[in-house]
């Protein structure tokens, strides 16, 4: 029984020690390299801040370094706040540049229109027949820069744009009178009862909005980059095989700004993109057939569009403050045309080969059965035609000839590009009327860098169509789809065995390397334990970066505060500044509510909420740990706040006691007021005690049958003094115990009363003295008893220590015996396994020999 008791005692002792020393407490870390996805507004930076669209942007000095992170992150170009903001912002810039000012009432009036007849004999392109000429060869379909037809505007397929001359009645400045106005419309923009003459209306007049251009801003190219506000950052997937959707990208870099991008608004093709490389690659939607194909810049693909002829614009006043721009045209303006240059056939063949090699592609591998096709019939003009904008004019180009050309098929004619004023909005549902276009001759030359397309695979997988698309937003999936916006969360929780924070100042080592605003993110791929030692420098770097970016934003806002209404960037700059300040103040308020203000490592008294959840300080990163404990942050935060409130209460009570440590505080004026209060309380207590004693004495005398002499009413003075012989024995009195009080009869009753009070107080003090003396007399036995108890406890502890030592030796011997038995068992098992494996191997090696012997026996 004795060894069993010793073992049980050892187990209980070890368990108690583990409970005391192995408890885990919440520790707050500030400056950890962790983040979460965010969706806050970005702001822009550009080198050219002289244009109207980028005047609110920060100056771009190309000082945007990227830091490699040793982490794995998910990227999605279609579920991405960066690309969504780019689409929204470019749309607002587009709207502002083309029509930044006044909304006019839709021109839904009946117009008497007739077709404009030109002075030339050029056939109407709508009625021209393809049988008037033989199908040209592919070489003849290319217009060179030196062709005479370009200078003379007589190239094949280049005709006049059909116009309609219309008249309508409307009130002008004089509201009581109607005036008749004349206007010229493109034939495609009006709907008439009769194609030659009759009543016509502006197409989509009930769903269109006319917006006038104030300052002749046109949709010119603008280059800028997005930057994250302070406290946020941008991650980029640097994997070469990234195709728009990657749940586990291993090559991740951190940056404060994106690459430089250029505004694009077109269908079918993307122009002047910044992602073109010496290869063709495809961004493919994760759950759809939508793609954006980046073309190889080696083939030098270009498109040059031109609108020849003169064009003038004449304003017509409809009413006060409302002006409609008419187009008086002496001769019909010529249609626009576009010429494609470069090695297009080779580029399109490489697109097909890249599609076949794409991991998402499940169709036929024969590139000869992969064709480029146009969208189906019945689509909007922006879908059916290639739509682009050339300095104010909206061109709709029929690309049938282009598809035949790149597929090396015979073509019947080369089509032109229509010019329209009423177009469908590419970002929102609706139609807009854009007025006025730029006067004079227009020419645009762009580099074709991408194709917007849908991959349509036949059910039987016999052929595949690459269908051109009108999703303008896909252009920005390619430009910014490899970025994602994150919010840096520098506050983290982790369990440690330290319960209190040590306020001992620590001297920082010399030569701390400051990494910059994103420098601490470079440690995101390192272990938690290694990075906890550098949190001080990281938090200082984070704060310095926030302050620096705040100052830059504030300078821009101050310089351009009178022009914030012009573009979307002014509002974004203000919002980015406010967001950064709110984020920093929120973090400091949180740390302060937990009692951890301005501390990098703050130990608390709050126990860790989940003992089974513990970090691997040597192998786990802070980002991995934060993903595991993110659901516990609310409970931990609440517990820390409650602990801090209790700590403040304890500190308040402790400070009240500390005020008595200094002798000077005892003589403070405020202390004397307290002393007076204490004195009043003592006097009141004495009076109450005397009243109680008086009542007790009165009751005692009543029990003895006496009526006290001093019970007479106040103010009564005895005139007859009773002189009693002091020498008379006590037993001669008429009452018992009267002799003891004979001394009080010599005085009148008030003096007797005072003597009685003094006598009672003396007896009270003597009683207290006797009690204290008795207690002190009993102190010696108590001391002897305490000494004996301490001796017994010491002997008991020595006995238990000996038992603990014996138990430890017994456990050590048991472990040694267990290890010896295990080693012998494993050695025997290994020998048996080795013998069995050897026999099986010999049997397998003997199989061919047995087969040969069996065959020989069978042949015999």
UniProtKB/Swiss-Prot annotation:
Extent of Low complexity compositional bias: 119-139
MPER: region residues: 656-677
Region (V1): 113-165
Alphabetized CDD domains for the sequence: HIV-1-like_HR1-HR2 (cd09909)
Stretch list, region Immunosuppression: 574-590
Site feature: Cleavage: 510-511
Alphabetized GO MF terms: structural molecule activity
Domain of life of the source: Viruses
Cytoplasmic side: 700-860
Region (V4) residue spans: 397-417
Segments forming a coiled coil: 623-644
Transmembrane segments annotated in the record for this chain: 679-699
GO annotation terms (biological process): clathrin-dependent endocytosis of virus by host cell; fusion of virus membrane with host endosome membrane; symbiont-mediated suppression of host innate immune response; symbiont-mediated-mediated suppression of host tetherin activity; virion attachment to host cell
SUPFAM superfamilies: gp120 core (SSF56502), Virus ectodomain (SSF58069)
GO cellular component terms attached to this protein's record: host cell endosome membrane; host cell plasma membrane; membrane; viral envelope; virion membrane
Keyword tags: AIDS, Apoptosis, Clathrin-mediated endocytosis of virus by host, Cleavage on pair of basic residues, Coiled coil, Disulfide bond, Fusion of virus membrane with host endosomal membrane, Fusion of virus membrane with host membrane, Glycoprotein, Host cell membrane, Host endosome, Host membrane, Host-virus interaction, Inhibition of host innate immune response by virus, Inhibition of host tetherin by virus, Lipoprotein, Membrane, Palmitate, Signal, Transmembrane, Transmembrane helix, Viral attachment to host cell, Viral envelope protein, Viral immunoevasion, Viral penetration into host cytoplasm, Virion, Virus endocytosis by host, Virus entry into host cell
Annotated stretches, region: Disordered: 118-139
Location of region: V3: 305-337
Stated name of the protein: Envelope glycoprotein gp160
Name of the coding gene: env
């Amino acid at each position: 029984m004795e060894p069993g008791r010793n073992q049980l005692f050892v187990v209980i002792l070890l368990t108690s020690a583990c409970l005391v020393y192995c408890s885990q407490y919440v520790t707050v870390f500030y400056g950890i390299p962790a983040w979460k996805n965010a969706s806050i507004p970005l702001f822009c930076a550009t080198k050219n801040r002289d244009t109207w669209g980028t005047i609110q942007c920060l100056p771009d000095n190309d000082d945007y370094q990227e830091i490699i992170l040793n982490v794995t992150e998910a990227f999605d170009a279609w579920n991405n706040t960066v690309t969504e903001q780019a689409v929204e912002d470019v749309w607002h810039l587009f709207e502002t540049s083309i029509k930044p000012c006044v909304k006019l009432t839709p021109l839904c009036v009946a117009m008497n229109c007739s077709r404009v007849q030109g002075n030339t004999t050029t056939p109407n392109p709508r009625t021209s027949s393809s049988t008037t000429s033989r199908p040209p060869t592919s070489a003849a379909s290319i217009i060179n820069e030196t062709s005479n037809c370009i200078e003379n505007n007589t190239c094949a397929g280049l005709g006049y744009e059909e116009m309609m001359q219309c008249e309508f009645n409307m009130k002008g400045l004089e509201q009581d009178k109607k005036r008749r106005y004349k206007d010229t419309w493109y034939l495609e923009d009006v709907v008439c009862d009769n194609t030659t003459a009759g009543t016509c209306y502006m197409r989509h007049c009930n769903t269109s909005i006319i917006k006038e251009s104030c300052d002749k801003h046109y949709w010119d190219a603008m280059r800028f980059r997005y930057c994250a506000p302070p406290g946020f950052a941008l991650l980029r997937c640097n994997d070469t095989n990234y195709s728009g959707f990657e749940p586990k990208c291993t090559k991740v870099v951190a940056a404060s700004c994106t690459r430089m991008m250029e505004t694009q608004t077109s269908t079918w093709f993307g122009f002047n993109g910044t992602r073109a490389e010496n290869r063709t690659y495809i961004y493919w939607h994760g759950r759809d057939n939508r793609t954006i194909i980046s073309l190889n810049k080696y083939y030098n693909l270009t498109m040059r569009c031109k609108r020849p002829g003169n064009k003038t614009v004449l304003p017509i006043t409809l009413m006060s403050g409302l002006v409609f721009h008419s187009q008086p045209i002496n001769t019909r303006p010529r249609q626009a045309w576009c010429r494609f240059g470069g090695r297009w056939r080779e580029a399109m063949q490489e697109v097909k080969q890249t599609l076949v090699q794409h991991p998402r592609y499940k169709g036929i591998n024969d590139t000869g059965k992969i064709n480029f096709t146009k969208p189906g019939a019945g689509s909007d003009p922006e879908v059916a035609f290639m739509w682009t904008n050339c300095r104010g004019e909206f061109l709709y180009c029929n690309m049938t000839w282009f598809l035949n050309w790149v597929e090396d098929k015979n073509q019947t004619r080369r089509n032109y590009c229509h010019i329209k004023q009423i177009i469908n909005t590419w970002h929102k549902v609706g139609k807009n009327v854009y007025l006025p276009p730029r006067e004079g001759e227009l020419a645009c030359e762009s580099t074709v860098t991408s194709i917007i397309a849908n991959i349509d695979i036949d059910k039987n997988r016999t052929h595949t169509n690459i269908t051109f698309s009108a999703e303008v937003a896909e252009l920005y999936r390619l430009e910014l789809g490899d970025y994602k916006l994150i919010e840096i969360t520098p506050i983290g929780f982790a369990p440690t065995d330290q319960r209190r924070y040590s306020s001992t100042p620590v001297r920082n080592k010399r030569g701390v390397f400051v990494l910059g605003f994103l420098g601490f993110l470079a440690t995101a791929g390192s272990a938690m334990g290694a990075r906890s030692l550098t949190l001080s420098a990281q938090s200082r770097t984070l704060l310095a970066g926030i302050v620096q970016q705040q100052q830059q934003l504030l300078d821009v806002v101050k310089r351009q505060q009178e022009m914030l209404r012009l573009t979307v960037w002014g509002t974004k700059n203000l919002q980015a500044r406010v967001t950064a300040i709110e984020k920093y103040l929120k973090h400091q308020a949180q740390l302060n509510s937990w009692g951890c203000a301005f501390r990098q490592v703050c130990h608390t008294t709050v126990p860790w909420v989940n003992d089974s959840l513990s970090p691997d300080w040597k192998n786990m990163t802070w980002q991995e740990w934060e993903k595991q404990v993110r659901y516990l942050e609310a409970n931990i935060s609440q517990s820390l706040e409650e602990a801090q409130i209790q700590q403040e209460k304890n500190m308040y009570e402790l400070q009240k006691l500390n005020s008595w440590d200094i002798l000077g505080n005892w003589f403070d004026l405020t202390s004397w007021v307290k002393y007076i209060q204490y004195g009043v309380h003592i006097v009141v207590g004495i009076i109450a005690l005397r009243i109680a004693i008086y009542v007790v004495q009165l009751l005692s005398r009543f029990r003895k049958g006496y009526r006290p002499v001093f019970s007479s009413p106040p103010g009564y003075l005895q005139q007859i003094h009773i002189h009693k012989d002091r020498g008379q024995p006590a037993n001669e009195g008429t009452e018992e115990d009267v002799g003891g009080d004979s001394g009080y009869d010599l005085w009148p009753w008030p003096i007797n009363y005072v003597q009685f009070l003094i006598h009672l107080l003396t007896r009270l003090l003597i009683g207290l003295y006797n009690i204290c003396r008795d207690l002190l007399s009993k102190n010696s036995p108590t001391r002897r008893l305490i000494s004996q108890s301490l001796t017994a406890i010491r002997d008991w502890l020595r006995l238990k220590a000996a038992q603990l030592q014996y138990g430890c030796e017994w456990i050590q011997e048991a472990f040694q015996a267990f290890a010896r038995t295990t080693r012998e068992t494993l050695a025997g098992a290994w020998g048996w396994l080795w013998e069995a494996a050897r026999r099986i191997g010999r049997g397998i090696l003997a199989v061919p020999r047995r087969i040969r012997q069996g065959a020989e026996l069978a042949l015999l």
